[in-house]
């Protein structure tokens, strides 16, 4: 087992990475102070790992209940969030009840938001079961739900007590979900660590075939990088925005097609292709680097052409992005691997990118 710590100055929490961790009671025990635990999961993950988690919690002597939600990005909304509150109130959960998020990014985001809201804040633990959630969404305290007009527009910054990333859970991940997670690994290397990006290029085939050592390294290094960024800028006042590379275009794709049509990581992968194209057009990035990024995204079996939503629709959706200010779209662009720039772009350049990178 590898442990990466997220140090926020006045508080910290561990990210435990390894195989078989869902069944290890000693990893959960230090973070559960009250007499009850509510596991929040979905209809896909609960049959796979729900019993193992509940068996691990049993020796702790806590009352354990489970809320099982429908699976998918389409359910990341108020109605589904209320199902969590219904479960908590039905169990008479109190302020010391610990929520455990067992699932991917949707479950983690909604459980964290529920924990932030219920009785104005209860503790929660992340148990991410997808590669995307292990390398990205479970770390850093971003929680929330979608709105029809924009992704993750309603939420809170609320940190978990711990993240328990069981690499073994990735063996049951569908191929599309695996590729979606690799997209966030690629993003992390591209924005923050050129040497890690080189490693990803050399090992993308190993990641595709779920080589345990490659997956463990990808999760570890991604978590180390994200932990350092979050420690420097917990609430996304500046530096942390670089983690949104590919997300301005990507969120527009998700909202424009309807949540769940493309996986989040698929949209981010394509969004990185689009952002790199815009970076070249603005004279920030050399074309050889753009080609390298495009190639590794394609090698991870991710889409490299965006849907034809139309220029006006893309612009409308990107203006709803959380980074936008007074309606001005802000992009995270590449100068070189490991070096980014947060900037606006002329509409003409954006239109040229859309013409070149969408169907």
Curated annotation (Swiss-Prot):
Q: Which GO terms describe its molecular function?
A: 3-dehydroquinate synthase activity; metal ion binding; nucleotide binding
Gene Ontology biological process terms from the UniProt entry: amino acid biosynthetic process; aromatic amino acid family biosynthetic process; chorismate biosynthetic process
Pfam annotation, one family: DHQS_C
Identify which top EC class this enzyme belongs to. lyase
Free-text cofactor note: Binds 1 divalent metal cation per subunit. Can use either Co(2+) or Zn(2+).
The record's section on Gene3D superfamilies has:
3.40.50.1970, Dehydroquinate synthase-like - alpha domain
Compartmental location:
Cytoplasm
Which Gene Ontology cellular component terms are annotated? Answer: cytoplasm
Q: Which residues bind NAD(+)?
A: 71-76, 105-109, 129-130, 142, 151
Q: Give the EC number(s) listed in the UniProt record.
A: 4.2.3.4
Required co-factor(s) are:
Co(2+); Zn(2+); NAD(+)
What positions does the entry give for Zn(2+) binding? 184, 247, 264
Q: In which pathway does it act?
A: Metabolic intermediate biosynthesis; chorismate biosynthesis; chorismate from D-erythrose 4-phosphate and phosphoenolpyruvate: step 2/7
Q: Which reaction does it catalyse?
A: 7-phospho-2-dehydro-3-deoxy-D-arabino-heptonate = 3-dehydroquinate + phosphate
Q: Which HAMAP family match?
A: DHQ_synthase
Homology family: Belongs to the sugar phosphate cyclases superfamily. Dehydroquinate synthase family.
The molecule here is called: 3-dehydroquinate synthase
- Record the organism: Burkholderia multivorans (strain ATCC 17616 / 249)
